[in-house]
């Protein structure tokens, strides 16, 4: 099943629902970063959460940055997700592995530990909106739902899941269901919705049972006036790094530092944190950067 996002409403627009399947992009992240089982689950959940949050943004080019900063051995998570369906991310310690938790599942909460969730929404106007909440469990889903309730005053249910088998990621994605103000006053509706979401065994078991997003929404909201939008948005792991950007970053270091790299290392090597792409600049290319800096200095002088 292709990585995709679908949107739906229910209760005459009082309920907003978004679902994502992120199996392939999570597997790509696992391979790029050589992630352990628990690191794959942690990053995969956070990437799905980032895409779900970005889906509510309106302006083209809008992006959400999600940073999980905990005191656990994972060393933190950073995800960048866009309204355009692209996402990238990394963890501090990709090789960390822990025993299963008390429920026999991957111990994402133990890997993350206690700390804070930082969310930055950039709608492209140059004034990003940022908010911080304390982590509830470190399991990502609880933490992002806590953020949505406290920072955006929107009651939200978030179900995230990543299943990692011996051969890699076989199922990943999530659901975001939000009760908007026009429906929040209907206590019976809210209680029914909460009960159904709480009754889910998780997200990945639904995918493994062969259900698609449309069927999952129908099971949860089918008797609440469900309307599923026909458009399916494709999702993918994508990083905007490039060799030109690396050269630009190296140039900022200045002549002395560049000359030192030429003498000591015969060039420079840089690895992108987000995608693990490795870029190598030769001594000749560094020398050209120095020449460019000298030319610019002459012109400005």
Swiss-Prot record:
One protein family per Pfam: HSP33
Any single GO BP term: protein refolding
Signal sequence range: none
Locations listed in the record: Cytoplasm
Keywords assigned: Chaperone, Cytoplasm, Disulfide bond, Redox-active center, Zinc
A GO molecular-function descriptor: unfolded protein binding
Main localization, broad class: cytoplasm
Transmembrane segment boundaries: none
GO cellular component entries: cytoplasm
PANTHER family per the UniProt record, alphabetical: 33 KDA CHAPERONIN (PTHR30111:SF1)
Function noted in UniProt: Redox regulated molecular chaperone. Protects both thermally unfolding and oxidatively damaged proteins from irreversible aggregation. Plays an important role in the bacterial defense system toward oxidative stress.
Family, per entry: Belongs to the HSP33 family.
Name used for this protein in its record: 33 kDa chaperonin
């Amino acid at each position: 099943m292709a990585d995709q996002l679908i949107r739906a409403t229910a209760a005459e627009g009082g309920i907003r629902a978004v679902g994502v399947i992120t199996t392939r992009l999570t597997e790509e992240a696992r391979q790029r970063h050589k992630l352990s089982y628990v690191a794959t689950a942690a990053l995969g959940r956070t990437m799905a959460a980032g895409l779900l949050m970005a889906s509510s943004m309106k302006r083209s080019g809008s992006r959400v940055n999600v940073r999980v900063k905990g005191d656990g051995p994972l060393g933190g998570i950073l995800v960048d997700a866009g309204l355009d369906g692209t996402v990238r991310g990394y963890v501090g310690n990709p090789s960390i592995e822990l025993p299963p938790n008390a429920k026999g599942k991957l111990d994402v909460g133990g890997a993350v530990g206690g700390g804070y969730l930082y969310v930055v929404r950039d709608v492209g106007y140059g004034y990003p909106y940022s908010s911080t909440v304390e982590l509830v469990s470190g399991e990502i889903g609880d933490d992002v739902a806590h953020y949505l309730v406290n920072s955006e005053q929107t009651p939200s249910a978030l179900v995230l899941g990543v299943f990692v088998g011996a051969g890699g990621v076989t199922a990943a994605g999530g659901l975001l269901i939000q009760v908007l103000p026009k429906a929040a006053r209907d206590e019976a509706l809210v209680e029914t919705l909460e009960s159904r979401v709480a009754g889910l065994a998780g997200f990945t078991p639904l995918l493994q049972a062969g259900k698609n997003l449309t069927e999952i929404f129908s099971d949860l909201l089918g008797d609440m006036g469900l309307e599923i939008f026909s458009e399916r948005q494709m999702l993918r792991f994508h990083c905007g790094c490039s060799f030109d950007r690396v050269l630009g970053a190296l140039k900022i270091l200045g002549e002395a530092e560049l000359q030192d790299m030429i003498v000591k290392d015969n060039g420079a090597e840089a690895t992108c944190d987000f995608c693990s792409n490795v870029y190598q600049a030769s001594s000749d290319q560094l020398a050209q950067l120095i020449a460019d800096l000298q030319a610019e200095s002459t012109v400005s002088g």
